[in-house]
């Protein structure tokens, strides 16, 4: 089973990328959001892979993060959601926004994804609501680490993000604002300072 691909981009199609790994090219089907974040032909590429084996067919699905891959599998645990719909949802909502939508039972946000009607959207937010908080927290942490590196002070940052979401901002907005605030405040800043700077970022 293939878990990750590291190679160079050979071709990017409408719903897939062809990754050249030492002369062997793999087709990985991806969300539109993932494809938009990839580089150009010839550039390096790293994808987390979910391998599907169906009778005589082997299919690879590629993701920028392990979290996106986890969401891909979690979405398909809901009746009526297959790989195509799961990718459509992830094309419309990144993990942080998806977790937030489910936590808030926001069927409208989920139903924006192609192929997701009212009934499927209802099942998604209902059946996954108990799983969303954990995923949301992980999404924020991953996003902040990507912005700032691994040396992020977890507690003040998490408290600041939580405070901004309680004020009505989306998790992605809050995480991005606090990431910017951390760059201004520097390491060791407390949550109060991060909240104040984060609000300034959001007011711009």
Curated annotation (Swiss-Prot):
Q: Which Pfam families match?
A: HHH_5, RuvA_C, RuvA_N
Q: Where is this region: Domain II?
A: 65-143
Biological process (GO) annotations? DNA recombination; DNA repair
Question: Which cellular compartments is it found in?
Answer: Cytoplasm
Name the SUPFAM superfamilies on file: DNA helicase RuvA subunit, C-terminal domain (SSF46929), Nucleic acid-binding proteins (SSF50249), RuvA domain 2-like (SSF47781)
Q: Positions of the region Flexible linker?
A: 144-151
Return the similarity comment: Belongs to the RuvA family.
Q: What is this protein called?
A: Holliday junction branch migration complex subunit RuvA
Gene of this entry: ruvA
């Amino acid at each position: 089973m293939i878990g990750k691909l590291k190679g160079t981009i050979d071709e990017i199609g409408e719903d897939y990328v062809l990754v050249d790994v030492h002369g062997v090219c793999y087709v990985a089907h991806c969300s539109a959001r993932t494809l938009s974040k990839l580089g150009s032909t010839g550039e390096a590429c790293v994808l987390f892979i979910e391998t599907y084996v169906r009778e005589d067919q082997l299919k690879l699905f590629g993701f920028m993060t392990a979290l996106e891959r986890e969401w891909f599998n979690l979405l398909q645990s809901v009746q009526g959601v297959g790989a195509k719909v799961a990718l459509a949802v992830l094309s419309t909502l990144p993990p942080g926004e998806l977790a937030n939508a489910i936590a808030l039972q926001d069927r409208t946000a989920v139903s924006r994804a192609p192929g997701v009607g009212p009934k499927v959207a209802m099942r998604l937010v209902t059946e996954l609501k108990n799983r969303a908080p954990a995923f949301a927290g992980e999404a924020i942490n991953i996003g902040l680490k990507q912005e700032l590196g691994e040396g992020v002070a977890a507690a003040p940052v998490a408290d600041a993000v939580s405070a901004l979401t309680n004020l009505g901002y989306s998790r992605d907005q809050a995480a991005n604002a606090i990431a910017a605030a951390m760059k201004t405040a520097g390491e060791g800043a407390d949550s109060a300072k991060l909240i104040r700077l984060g609000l300034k970022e959001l007011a711009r």
